[in-house]
Amino acid sequence: MTEITQLFQYNTLGALMAGLYEGTMTIGELLKHGDLGIGTLDSVDGELIVLDGKAYQAKGDKTIVELTDDIKVPYAAVVPHQAEVVFKQKFTASDKELEDRIESYFDGQNLFRSIKITGEFPKMHVRMIPRAKSGTRFVEVSQNQPEYTEENVKGTIVGIWTPEMFHGVSVAGYHLHFISEDFTFGGHVLDFIIDNGTVEIGAIDQLNQSFPVQDRKFLFADLDIEALKKDIDVAE
C-alpha cells in the first residue's frame, strides 16, 4: 500500500494577514506532523524554519535560535518530506530560473509540493518579520521588515509550493525559508542565485488543515477575504 504524505498546516496565512499573531500551538506538537516546513512565531517574531525535524527561529537582529518544544506558533506548515524527484543543479541560476526548472518536473499544477534545496549560493536575500502586536495588519508590519543579503553562503532552502486554488489558505506558488549550513543566517527567501546544489521535490497527497479552535479572537474575527488575498500578494 502506498504511504500517504500529508501536509499539516496550522491556521491559515489569511488569518495571519489579518493580525492574528498569538501563538497557540507548541513546537513540540507541530513537529509530530512533519520534519520540513515554514511558519512564524508568537507575535510574528521572525521566521520559523523546520529542517530535518528541528525548528529554528530567524530573528530580526539576524540571529538564529534553535527552538524548544514549549515555544508557540500562530501559523506554520510542515510535512514529512519524501523526495519524489531529485536533481543536481550544476550551473548558475537565479531563483526564477530554478523555480521554472522545478515546476517542469511537476505532474500537474493542482497539488502541493514540498521543496528542499541544498547548495552554494553566491547571493541569498532574506527578510525577517519584526515582532508586532496582534491586530496590526501583516502588510503594515512587513513595511518595516529588516532585510539581509549574504554572499557565497552554503545552506538549505525549505518550503512549500501551493496551487493557485489554495491562495489565501497559503500563498500561491513558492513559500521558501533559508538557513545556512552553520546555522548563523536565515529567513524568508526574497531572491537568490545558486551556483550548484541538490534539489528535492516531494509529492503531497493530502492537506490536514488545523485551526486554533480555543482562540476566541480567531473564532470571532471578521475577515475581509478579498483584502487579505491582496495583502498576501504584497507581503509574501
From Swiss-Prot:
Keyword annotations from UniProtKB, A to Z: Acetoin biosynthesis, Decarboxylase, Lyase
Enzyme Commission identifier(s): 4.1.1.5
A GO BP annotation: acetoin biosynthetic process
GO molecular function: acetolactate decarboxylase activity
Record's keyword annotation contains Lyase: yes
InterPro entries: Acetolactate_a_deCO2ase
Pfam family for this entry, one: AAL_decarboxy
UniProt keyword Repressor, yes or no: no
Reaction(s) this enzyme catalyzes, per UniProt: (2S)-2-acetolactate + H(+) = (R)-acetoin + CO2
Pathway: Polyol metabolism; (R,R)-butane-2,3-diol biosynthesis; (R,R)-butane-2,3-diol from pyruvate: step 2/3
EC class: lyase
Family statement drawn from the similarity comment of this UniProt entry: Belongs to the alpha-acetolactate decarboxylase family.
Described purpose of this protein according to its UniProt entry: Converts acetolactate into acetoin.
Protein name, per record: Alpha-acetolactate decarboxylase
